[in-house]
Amino acid sequence: TELLAKHYGWEAHFEDVIDNPYLNDFYNHMERWSFNLQIYFLKSRFEQLLKIKNNDGSIVQDRTIYEDAHIFAPNLKSMGLMNLRDFKNYQELFDLMESQIQGPNLLIYLRSNIPNLVNKIHKRGRDYENSISIEYLSRLNERYEAWTSTYNKGKLITIDVDELDFVENKKDFEIIVEKLDGELKEIGAA
């Protein structure tokens, strides 16, 4: 997100992981804090979308409101980490919010295998992420694949990043930019 914002001159909107009062608690006791965390992210992303709606410039967001509703919350429910009552409450709130927003012009899905994801998580160095299980990551990956295969809110580009290190390697970043340039021209955003 940061690299794309800098390259294209876009305004960046990041996932709130620093000020999030539930994140550390969630990773220590997922079942207890899953609903609170998902509601916090839903509120945070909706606030971002309201700001974006009133902005004339180009924006890049590191995670969409749709990912929580179609991937993270359902994953927590299916793993028994969010009960059905809380999940339904969450979904109804998401549905209400979704009726007030517009999908992104372009969604970029960075596809990655589990070993690569684990490596990136460790590189980030966030202590609270040390307890993330392989099962949890695998289920998220499966849900991302299913969701992106039916995504219909706008244009979607999938980039396999298993062999790319676009943060450390400028040539790898240029590969991504080249792919994006073509898509941006196609949607009239270049």
Residue ranges and their predicted role:
Residues H13, Q61, L106-I108, I157-I159:
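Hydrophobic/aromatic beta-strand patches that form the interior of the parallel beta-sheet core
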Residues T1-A5:
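Post-Walker A alpha-helix
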Residues V17-D19, I65-E67, S112-L117, E163-F166:
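Conserved nucleotide-binding/hydrolysis micro-motifs of P-loop NTPases
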Residues W10, I101-L106, N152-K155:
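Short glycine-/polar-rich loops that comprise or flank the Walker A/P-loop
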Residues K6-S44:
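Conserved substrate/cofactor phosphate-moiety recognition/catalytic segment
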Residues H70-E145:
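A glycine- and Lys/Arg-enriched "phosphate-lid" helix/loop adjacent to the NTP-binding pocket
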Residues R45-N83:
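A basic- and aromatic-enriched beta-loop-alpha substructure that forms the phosphate/nucleotide-
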Residues V118-A190:
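NTP-dependent small-molecule kinase module
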